[in-house]
A protein has these predicted regions:
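Basic, amphipathic alpha-helical segments enriched in Lys/Arg and hydrophobic/aromatic residues
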Residues: 149-223
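Short amphipathic alpha-helical segments
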Residues: 9, 31, 162-166
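Extended amphipathic alpha-helical interaction segments
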Residues: 19, 25-28, 34-159, 178, ...
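Active-site beta-loop-alpha junctions of metal-dependent nucleic acid enzymes
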Residues: 1-21, 26
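Compositionally biased, low-structure terminal segments
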Residues: 11, 15, 44, 75-76, ...
Length: 224
């Protein structure tokens, strides 16, 4: 738990992961200014991927797409041809040129959006460099909504330390509880806990988990 989402907080988080021998290849996040410098300090070889959902939402808000039709066609074309169909470098180039050529005439505002995407192209499409890497934070956002729902039943904590202990217990439970309702490409996760796919096979099994009655993990081939 950290009091603010700043470079210091991210640095401490990454350092703890480093101390646990957790090898980070990619960090998927929204556009927080402190993440990149913190990542470079601890995991200089790791890549940053900006969340497409957040990035597109910022453009949608800037252009008032939900309430005005003026830029709606531009936005839908951008989302389709660049962020959905842009599954490799060539398609990204083609998508950007298509939108620039057909939807930005005489509009410096729209042209600036395209040039900004080109300028930040690497952090927007780094996910293509790692197989099955997500390009959004939907999963963690869903996880956070579950946590927020659980916190509604808690009246309060006596101290920051007690809140930290409660959160640790919540995370342990969530990490060791088998999935039951996964569908589509995530269906294989059912009957497995998330810890099965991340913990190293040679890792020491914490006593606290044994005390909680969590003493067996059925490692799958996905954890190799």
């Amino acid at each position: 738990m950290y009091p603010a989402e700043d470079e210091m907080a991210f640095s401490q988080l990454f350092q703890k992961l480093y101390d646990l021998n957790y090898d980070i290849k990619m960090v998927v996040a929204d556009d927080r200014p402190g993440i990149k410098p913190a990542l470079n300090k601890v995991f200089p070889y790791a890549k940053l991927q900006l969340c497409h959902v957040h990035y597109l939402e910022n453009i949608r808000t800037e252009l008032r797409v939900r309430t005005e039709e003026r830029y709606r066609h531009f936005f839908n074309s951008l989302r389709l041809h660049v962020f959905i169909e842009g599954t490799d470098e060539k398609k990204i180039d083609q998508g950007l040129e298509h939108v620039l050529r057909n939807h930005t005439a005489h509009s410096p505002k729209l042209q600036d959006i395209i040039w900004e995407i080109k300028r930040r192209r690497e952090v927007l499409f780094n996910y293509l460099k790692i197989q099955d890497c997500p390009n959004n934070t939907n999963l963690i956002e869903l996880y956070n909504s579950h946590l927020a729902g659980r916190l509604k039943t808690v009246k309060g904590f006596q101290s920051f330390f007690s809140a930290q202990k409660w959160l640790n217990a919540f995370l342990i439970r969530r990490r060791t509880k088998p999935f039951t309702d996964c569908e589509g490409k995530f269906k294989y996760l059912n009957k497995h806990s998330s810890l099965e796919f991340t913990i190293k096979k040679q890792a020491f099994w914490p006593d606290v988990l044994t005390k909680l009655g969590i003493s067996k993990i059925n490692f799958s081939e996905k954890s190799d």
